[in-house]
């Protein structure tokens, strides 16, 4: 099966403390039902379901629509939930990762409008979790982006709160190539910025979709934040990063990251997964972990 052979497994469900799943955008060519069937047959218990608007993808792994939130109604939602239940697979979150702080006003509005639809769908499906990016204007500094995030996200969070939906922000900088230079397209990349975001946006419905791999190439500690932000970790990604130190010595850390690192599947990179899982359990995270795109 294209793109997903690395996820095939003979594991049987054993009621583990952490339910394992994956983000469905890795199976872009398959229907929602086919994805659920694959998950069930291979021992996965949950799915982070891709909910981009239909149309041409703006980047790899975007533009995947396994649930079309623009046409979702209560009948279709019930049908989806029944299909999942019959196969013992749950939906952990609806995934949509745009840039709602885009410098282009039209792009920003389209992203926000669709995000609102995803929030509605999460409530309709009783998933009550949306995974996304905080966004970033890549040509503004951090301070100006924080002010922009506060302005843009307050009404989004009010909307989510009224529907009982949590928003889990991933910490990927979205800075890989010259297209995202100089600042990347996601602001929420570090503990220092998280503190400021949570201060400016003090909502119990705003938290993190924690991916340790992005700390690796930024040369940051990915274990310590698990303690400090334990109450804000709503969702967790499983992805690894392998840093090529010879390449980094050649180009320097200010080069575009893909020139000295490689995203990869868990166990093939530099994340200490035993320690990571141990600390997640120690801090009380008894929920879901998801294999993310190897990019």
Predicted regions and their residues:
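Short glycine/proline-rich, acidic loop/turn segments that cap or connect secondary-structure elements
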Residues: 275-288
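Active-site beta-loop-alpha junctions enriched in small/polar residues
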Residues: 23-27, 50-54, 96-99, 135-137, ...
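Acidic/histidine-rich catalytic cores of soluble enzymes
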Residues: 18-20, 30, 144, 150-270, ...
């Amino acid at each position: 099966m294209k793109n997903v052979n690395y996820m095939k497994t003979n594991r049987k469900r054993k009621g583990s403390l952490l339910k394992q799943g994956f983000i469905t955008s890795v199976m872009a060519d398959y229907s929602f039902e086919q994805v659920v069937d694959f998950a069930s047959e291979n021992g996965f218990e949950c799915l982070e379901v891709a909910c981009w608007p239909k149309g041409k993808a703006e980047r790899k792994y975007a533009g995947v629509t396994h649930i079309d939130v623009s046409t979702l109604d209560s009948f279709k939602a019930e049908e989806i939930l029944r299909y999942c239940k019959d196969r013992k697979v749950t939906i952990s979150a609806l995934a949509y990762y745009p840039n709602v702080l885009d410098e282009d006003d039209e792009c920003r509005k389209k992203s926000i409008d669709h995000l609102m639809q995803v929030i509605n769908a999460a409530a309709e499906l009783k998933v009550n979790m949306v995974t996304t990016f905080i966004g970033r204007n890549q040509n503004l500094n951090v301070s100006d982006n924080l002010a922009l995030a506060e302005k843009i996200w307050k009404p989004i969070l009010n909307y989510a709160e009224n529907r009982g939906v949590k928003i889990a922000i991933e910490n990927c900088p979205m800075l890989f190539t010259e297209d995202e230079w100089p600042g990347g397209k996601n602001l929420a990349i570090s503990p220092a910025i998280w503190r400021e975001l949570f201060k400016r946006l003090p909502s119990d419905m705003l938290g993190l979709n924690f991916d340790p791999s992005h700390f690796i190439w930024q040369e940051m500690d990915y274990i310590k934040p698990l303690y400090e932000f334990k109450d804000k970790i709503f969702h967790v990604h499983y992805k690894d990063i392998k840093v090529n130190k010879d390449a980094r010595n050649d180009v320097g850390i200010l080069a575009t990251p893909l020139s000295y690192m490689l995203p990869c599947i868990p166990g093939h990179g530099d994340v200490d997964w035993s320690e990571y899982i141990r600390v997640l359990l120690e801090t009380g995270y008894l929920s879901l972990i998801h294999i993310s795109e190897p990019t």
